[in-house]
Design a protein with these regions (language model features):
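Conserved beta-alpha junction segments in alpha/beta enzyme cores
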Residues: 4-9, 18-161, 167-329, 333-340, ...
Length: 516
């Protein structure tokens, strides 16, 4: 009898412990942070001032390891072992985010950055931040934004991830196992500190400027593929060059394109920002080799913002990239191929800026609409990750995730922010209701978001202030057989999405703020 009492007591203690753990890990990290901003400036236009800055967020690789079977997975049970370089008798890995678990970095190929462009019209100050990361969760973004609002004073801050798959895990799901986070807490704090410093420096660097805006909407089609039907891309390159209004010197640039920075693929073990590194460098310094200069750079600091990458947009090893200097076709997953890709993109952006179609403005006003929204968490794997603390993300209400959207207008430039990886058909059109769909419905996410945006230059900032995963048209959702287009298995995407309501909610919410 006494034994049964002890068992029951232990069971009750276990239930209490689990309940406390669940409530703690699912708590709203920022219950005081809810956005509903409307800055619709209808007054006199004024001079635009702009500032740029960048700060490194490259991790220190203290220990390396020996990958005996070359599969880019640290597997001690199969003979892999680490090199205790710092002599502390334990393995101190930096887990790379993207592709698969247990991929510790072996070194650094090129630096990672927090890069910032600040726009100021005299009334409203907007900070646009890009960090070289696979993703940055809303709660962590809010940590930075609260500090910025308190100590720097920007009216609105956008923190977008490049979604590079060769940088440290800042989400948690690419650690040593499915049940242990891959986030290094010290590195996370370093990223936050450096990002705040970059924003502060950019604000201090603000000077009156003119903006030169250009785009090439089709030239980059050969450098990206859609790995899921329907075949819909978002291939347009859009670029803003900011020049000191007095000296004509380039302060910096913001360039956007839509593709997964994963050209180096799954067996790369060196920290890198992938093709954005070469893209930014080409814009800043030009496209050249030891013999030939194909295009002069514009100088300044280039900020890369990713776009509609869902679907997913990729440059896989079998997709060739032509060398810009010769007839070589680069295949596989190499740095030469990744460099060629970045240089080709840089050429397109630079040529667009130098074309007769580029526009210039020196005066405008910033209009802004931003709003907190909630989306149901309908993904068992994500929920388990939240509960176990593998993903350090809170919920509100009955398993809802809090996130954010925004719409910005600066002269002919319009911007919408997306808190994840949106499918291009939601942005540009082409949502379908194919055979095999899980929900027997017509397309919901219509009309396309870009068709509702004003201005000539329509930027879509993906993974902005959050990374909620794939944002899939509900009429294309497919987890159970029969599968879409009579395929033999379900497509990739749903496994890394909050759920089927994410697409409709994001679309309707952005439509609402665009109609404001």
């Amino acid at each position: 009898m006494k034994f049964i009492k002890y068992v029951l007591l232990a069971f009750i203690v276990l239930i209490i412990f689990f309940t406390v753990l669940v409530n703690y890990n699912l708590r709203d990290r920022h219950p005081d942070f809810n956005i509903d901003i409307s800055l619709k400036n209808n007054g006199q236009i004024s001079t635009i001032s702009v500032g740029f800055a960048k700060m490194p967020i490259t991790p220190d690789i203290t220990d390396t390891w020996n990958d005996l079977n070359g599969n880019a997975r640290y597997e001690p049970d199969k003979g892999d072992f680490y090199n205790d370089i710092n002599g502390n008798n334990r393995f101190d890995p930096i887990w790379i985010g993207g592709f698969h678990n247990s991929r510790p970095a072996q070194g650094v190929h090129d630096d990672l950055w927090a890069r910032v462009m600040v726009l100021d019209d005299g009334k409203t100050q907007l900070a646009i931040v890009s960090i070289d990361a696979v993703g940055f969760i809303y709660d962590d973004a809010v940590d930075i934004r609260k500090e910025v609002k308190k100590n720097i004073g920007c009216d609105y801050t956008i923190i977008s991830s490049t979604h590079v798959h060769q940088a440290p895990d800042l989400i948690g799901i690419w650690g040593p196992s499915y049940f242990k986070s891959g986030v290094n807490k010290q590195y996370m704090q370093y990223v936050k500190k450096q990002t705040i410093s970059a924003i502060s420096t950019a604000v201090k660097n603000i000077v009156p400027a003119k903006l030169k805006i250009a785009q090439d909407l089709k030239g980059a089609i050969p450098f990206v593929v859609d790995s899921r039907d329907p075949q819909e891309l978002d291939p347009g390159i859009r670029i803003i060059q900011a020049l000191d209004i007095n000296t004509e010197e380039t302060l910096g640039s913001l360039v956007s394109w839509s593709n997964h920075p994963e050209t180096l693929w799954s067996k790369n073990l060196l920290i890198s920002s992938d093709f954005p590194h070469f893209f930014r460098s080409s814009i800043e310094n030009g496209v050249f080799n030891e013999d030939t200069t194909l295009a002069e750079g514009i100088g300044g600091i280039s900020v890369f913002i990713n776009g509609a990458v869902g679907g997913l947009m990729t440059t896989n090893p079998s997709h060739p990239i032509p060398d810009p200097f010769n007839s070589t076709l680069h295949e596989g997953a190499t740095f030469k191929k990744t460099q060629a890709q970045g240089q080709q993109l840089g050429l397109l952006a630079l040529r667009a800026l130098r074309s007769k179609d580029a526009k210039e403005i020196s005066k405008s006003i910033i209009s802004l609409r931003a709003k907190t929204i909630t989306i149901p968490l309908d993904n068992t794997n994500f929920l388990l990750g939240f509960i176990l603390g593998v993903i350090d993300h809170g919920t509100i209400g009955w398993f809802n995730v809090k996130t954010e959207i925004a719409s910005i207008q600066v002269g002919p430039i319009s911007i919408i922010t997306i808190p994840g990886e949106i499918y291009p058909e939601i942005v540009n059109g082409g949502v379908v209701s194919p055979i095999g769909q899980d929900y027997n419905i017509d397309p919901i996410e219509i009309p396309p978001l870009r068709s509702m945006m004003k201005g000539e230059y329509k930027f879509v900032f993906g993974l902005a202030n959050d990374e909620i995963g794939y944002i899939i048209p509900k009429s294309e959702w497919d987890e159970v057989p029969p599968y879409l287009y009579n395929h033999h298995k379900s497509p990739y995407g749903e496994i890394n999405s909050l759920g089927p309501e994410a697409g409709p909610i994001i679309h309707s919410s952005i439509r609402e703020i665009l109609e404001y």
